[in-house]
């Protein structure tokens, strides 16, 4: 699958226009307070571009997974349809107002906001309430998504998408609105995601290594299958490594293993060999008898895990080997941790991979891409995120791209000629 470049907000005429921007403000909120505003700050360049060029912004986002009302439901006597206190975007309106240094209007019902939209003047900002307060946003029926999209599209003139994290979902705000308006532009965040993934999938600087970890082979089958035709090296870590180890006849103690995936692991290793992809698996391990932290976990001397022990991180010799592989590459894509990095005693492998990628990027011009989710969290925790070429904002979306799938929320945007 090739990823086609899309027209960006720089190609759109926004002066005197009302610009509908699908952002990703799905931020953690505790007791009405935002605990991490990274996603809000990430959307600022796109919003500021519209304001600077003399347009106004209508911001749309989801937050959490509220149940959602139907558009046909009667309006309650008090409040709005579908409202859930835990998922309101009202705290986000206050935070974005602080960050932009200007008042941000808030429409308490995203499907009853025409009066708010009509009052917008150039350089004004309006945030609509959580689009998932309506079930039609993520309905499996296209006609239901389209009905909601038509209402939202009527508020504005231009559609911009900056929500890569939900690009793998067909929804009223991701695919419905650009369909109604006949065009869609990528915001700066979305553009960066598309540009980096298109480079790594279509024309990466070589050699290219894929570092794949996490718990289950079954979660990464399609990714491995798709990437084997594109990469030069494959580095495997995390619990999934032990299904491969067992498939090769190694002793894995009581480490996690998907017994029903042993044949699949063998066939993936065979396919790698046929495609001249060199595969690296752990040669030593950090183990414990139970799945819990230990002051001094056992470090094995060999590739075999002793009976009664489970491997919970890669060992020092494996770390050295993986650092060396990353060091000889020009591009690296990382999806999934090397161990149970949430426990400090099993975080060395994951953090070492992050450091090798960060150092390679800063010193040797490595193109480093972190595929969202746990890997992005690990890169942040290790302090290396700032040193990477690109840390993806979408776990599910980046995984589907690496699996060779088309993302509906990207495909719908207008192609760059």
UniProtKB/Swiss-Prot annotation:
AMP binds at residues 215-216, 220, 239, 311, 342. Mg(2+) binds at residues 215, 219, 374. Its main location: cytoplasm. It catalyses: (2R)-3-phosphoglycerate + ATP = (2R)-3-phospho-glyceroyl phosphate + ADP. The keyword Magnesium applies. Keywords: ATP-binding, Cytoplasm, Glycolysis, Kinase, Magnesium, Metal-binding, Nucleotide-binding, Transferase. Its EC number is 2.7.2.3. (2R)-3-phosphoglycerate binds at residues 23-26, 39, 61-62, 64-65, 132, 168-169, 216. This cytosolic PGK lacks a C-terminal extension of 38 AA which is present in the glycosomal isoenzyme. Belongs to the phosphoglycerate kinase family. Monomer. This is Phosphoglycerate kinase, cytosolic. The lineage of its organism: Eukaryota, Discoba, Euglenozoa, Kinetoplastea, Metakinetoplastina.
């Amino acid at each position: 699958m090739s990823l086609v470049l899309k027209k960006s907000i720089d190609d759109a005429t926004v002066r005197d226009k009302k610009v509908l921007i699908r952002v990703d403000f799905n931020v953690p909120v505790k007791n009405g307070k935002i605990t991490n505003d990274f996603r809000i700050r990430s959307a600022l360049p796109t919003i500021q571009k519209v304001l600077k060029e003399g347009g106004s912004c209508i911001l749309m986002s989801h937050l959490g997974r509220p149940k959602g009302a139907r558009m046909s439901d009667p309006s309650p006597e008090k409040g709005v349809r579908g409202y859930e206190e835990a998922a309101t975007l009202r705290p986000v309106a206050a935070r974005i107002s602080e960050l932009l240094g200007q008042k941000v209007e808030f429409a308490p019902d995203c499907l009853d906001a025409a009066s708010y939209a009509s009052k917008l003047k150039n350089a004004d900002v309006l945030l609509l309430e959580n689009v998932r307060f309506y079930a039609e946003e993520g309905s499996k029926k296209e006609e239901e998504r389209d009905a909601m999209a038509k209402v939202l599209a009527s508020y504005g003139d231009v559609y911009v998408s900056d929500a890569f994290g939900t690009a793998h979902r067909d929804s009223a705000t991701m695919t419905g609105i650009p369909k109604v308006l006949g065009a869609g532009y990528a915001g700066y965040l979305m553009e960066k995601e598309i540009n980096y993934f298109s480079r790594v999938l279509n024309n990466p600087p070589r050699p290219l290594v894929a570092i794949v970890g996490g718990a289950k082979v079954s979660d990464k089958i399609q990714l491995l299958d798709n990437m084997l035709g594109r990469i030069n090296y494959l580095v495997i870590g995390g619990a999934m490594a032990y299904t491969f180890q067992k498939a090769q006849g190694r002793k894995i103690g009581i480490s996690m293993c998907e017994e029903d995936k042993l044949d699949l692991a063998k066939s993936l290793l065979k396919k790698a060999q046929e495609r001249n992809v060199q595969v690296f698996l752990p040669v030593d391990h950090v183990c414990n008898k139970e799945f819990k932290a230990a002051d001094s976990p056992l470090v094995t001397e060999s590739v075999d895990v002793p009976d009664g022990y489970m491997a919970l991180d890669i060992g020092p010799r494996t770390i050295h080997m993986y650092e060396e592989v990353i060091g000889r590459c020009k591009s690296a894509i990382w999806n999934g941790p090397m161990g149970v990095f949430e426990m400090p005693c099993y975080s060395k492998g994951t953090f070492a991979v992050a450091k090798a990628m960060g150092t390679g990027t800063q010193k040797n011009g490595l193109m480093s891409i972190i595929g969202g989710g746990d890997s992005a969290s690990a890169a942040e925790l290790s302090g290396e995120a700032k040193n990477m070429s690109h840390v993806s904002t979408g776990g599910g979306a980046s995984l589907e791209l690496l699996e060779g799938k088309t993302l509906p929320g990207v495909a719908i945007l207008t192609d760059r000629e």
